[in-house]
Amino acid sequence: MATLSNFEIPFYSKNGWLAPLDTYISGDPGFDQADILKPMATSLTGSDGKVYGEPFYGESSFLMYRKDVFAAKHLTMPANPTWAQVATLAKEASGAQPGMRGICLRGQPGWGEVLAPLTTVVNTFGGTWFDKNWTARLNAAPFTAATSFYVNLVKSYGEPGASQAGFTECLNNFEQGKVAMWYDATSAAGSLDGAGSPVAGKVGYAPAPVDLTKSSGWLYTWAWAIEKASKHQSAAWKFISWASGKGYIQTAGQNLGWARVPPGTRTSTYSNPSYLKQASAFAQPTLTAIDSANPTNPGIQPRPTPGIQFVDIPEFTDFGTSVSQLISNAIAGQISVSNALSQSQSLAQSAGNKYKS
């Protein structure tokens, strides 16, 4: 058995490394595959239409903000904010409390750090890493506009030390009252509104900001898969059926607390009265964010692979990390955005050339 994400499963399955789960699913009606959130199920399905993974954790992204700070400054969060509106709000919220900055955005190097939120901005600004013919588009106008916007926003109204701030640093900044807004993973809500959080009850949740698209949240899930070479596939499925099943959600809620159950996996979780009682502030915004995510068509132009905040090829972990370092350097003011993207274009095209027909 293996624990994989929706990044690896599409190409692992294509390479023949994973066993399809469809036979096990059909023979286990109690598992209730139809209850798995559709975007998660889609992202764990191979190009052959077969299921290769079952989620045990899932997330999208949304905008978190301090309701009390907004009220004190007479600011209003739109129901579906645009990035232009968020930039204005970040400016107006900066300094709302001593030392408070308007927004926290990841700047830490890593294909799963700064590139996750940045790529959602690129998508909604009309950009893409590659066109459908594997021509890199990092120095094209939409990608440049999105990156310039992101870098300028975090430099102008973002957290101190932004070039080294990842999820954990932004979580700490938001909890400690150092920022008024934070765009990041829906999973953060469980900490922000959890018992003992200094901002519990003070946080509002809005959809991922947009520009040219209707939605822009990312999609990520950790999942169980079965290796094709396994000699114990039936036993592996029994574990998966338990660990990703409805019963596990119930057991976790009763023993650990409902706010700590695995998020983003099953539709039934979001209609469970016990869960909603503890997660009422963020349950519906989380479900809406996940349901709105479109991993096969996240932008406004065709692209060669699925994936919202990543390019779904093995090489992305390498060239993506190199690109992220250049973006982080731009946030730190060490190089210009145009210089960063010029170098990034070459890195991406070198990887894309392998896939050109």
Regions found by a protein language model. Give the residues of each.
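Paired acidic/hydrophobic, glycine-rich loop segments that form the ligand-binding mouth/hinge
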Residues: 1-3, 180-185
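Hinge/lid segment of periplasmic solute-binding proteins
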Residues: 6-60, 85, 114-117, 200-206, ...
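Short helix-initiation/N-cap motifs at beta->coil->alpha
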Residues: 7, 81-87, 161-175
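Short helices/loops that flank or line small-molecule/ion binding pockets
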Residues: 15, 69-70, 87-95, 168-182, ...
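Short, solvent-exposed loop/beta-turn-alpha elements that line the ligand-binding surface or hinge
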Residues: 22-36, 79, 103, 107-110, ...
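Conserved C-terminal helix/tail region of periplasmic/extracytoplasmic solute-binding proteins
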Residues: 71, 294-357
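Glycine-centered hinge/linker elements that transmit conformational signals in sensory
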Residues: 89-92, 132-164, 204-208
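C-terminal lobe and pocket-closing loops
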Residues: 187-199, 212-321
